[in-house]
Amino acid sequence: MSETTAMARDEAGAIGPGRLVLVVGPSGAGKDTLLRLAQAACRDDPGIVFPRRIVTRAASADEDNVAVSSDEFRRAREHGEFAVQWEAHGHSYALPCDINDDIRAGRAVVANVSRTVLAALRHAYANVVVVAITAPPDVLAQRLAARARQSDGNIAERLSRSVDDASAQADVTILNAGSAEYHSRQLVRVIKGEGWQE
């Protein structure tokens, strides 16, 4: 099971006034593709930040993560460098503490996280929006098989995991079964607080 740790709230309460936009969903849903397109669309907006996750697995061309060893991750955690950290599929993941400064400055921070940290982050931050990105099971299976990433492990096992929890906790759900450009525009509207339906 996943281990999660979230940083304590500010002395005055939950960290704000900026927004924390959390993207969750099953492997193969296209989260990283939509995030990459959304980041490109928001690149000229200084009020929107896409922090790089710290991860204890090899870097991937599809993700903009900071790859570190398990020892480096442990040392950073012990030095309080993470706003939140979690374990999933045999790897450690974290978001840097810098996101707290961005949130306090009123910026929107957008991050791909595990659904296991949602409750802790909703408690620690004043303005949280959870976006669940999903796709039909056959599409998920095709995408996982096509990317053939060793860290994906057993595809059937991944697909058998329930994604209902993430959708139930989501403020917005994007069914990513069509054009990535179309769905990334939906995500950008959510990030900017404009709603998402066309």
Predicted features, each with a name:
Residues 26:
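P-loop (Walker A) phosphate-binding loop of NTP-binding proteins
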Residues 23:
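Hydrophobic anchor at the beta1->P-loop junction of P-loop NTPases
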